[in-house]
């Protein structure tokens, strides 16, 4: 679920950045999404949106499903997740969080005018 996703993000970046920093970033981080991602970090969000979309096509509810994950020294990983939907959502969240941690955060892409820049 979205609360767990925020913890997974914090785990992946080792507490260097709040998950809230990603809630209104670029064209795809946060609610909705359209146009071309503004950078690699925004592309991570588009991939995550697409991953949730695939989960929904499989009959899953990614924004509400709970899953078991572990935050280790190498970052988050899904743990003992046997149900198909829960596993899919956990995999989506961990992949996105790791993608966030790998890519630079550009403050200029926070809270952008999506009507102008996301066409």
Swiss-Prot record:
Its cofactor is Ca(2+). It catalyses: a 1,2-diacyl-sn-glycero-3-phosphocholine + H2O = a 1-acyl-sn-glycero-3-phosphocholine + a fatty acid + H(+). It comes from the Eukaryota. SUPFAM superfamilies: Phospholipase A2, PLA2. It is found in: Secreted. Its main location: secreted. One of its GO terms (biological process) is arachidonate secretion. It is an enzyme of class 3 (hydrolase). Binds 1 Ca(2+) ion. InterPro entries: PLipase_A2, PLipase_A2_Asp_AS, PLipase_A2_dom, PLipase_A2_dom_sf, PLipase_A2_His_AS. This is Basic phospholipase A2.
């Amino acid at each position: 679920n979205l609360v767990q996703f925020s913890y997974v993000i914090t785990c992946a970046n080792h507490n260097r950045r709040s998950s809230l920093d990603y809630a209104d970033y670029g064209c795809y981080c946060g609610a909705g999404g359209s146009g071309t991602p503004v950078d690699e970090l925004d592309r991570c969000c588009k991939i995550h949106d697409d991953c949730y979309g695939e989960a929904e096509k499989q009959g899953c509810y990614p924004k509400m499903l709970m899953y078991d994950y572990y935050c280790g020294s190498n970052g988050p990983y899904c743990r003992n997740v046997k149900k198909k939907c829960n596993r899919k959502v956990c995999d989506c969240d961990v992949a996105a969080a790791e993608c966030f941690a790998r890519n630079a955060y550009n403050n200029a892409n926070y809270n952008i005018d999506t009507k102008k820049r996301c066409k």
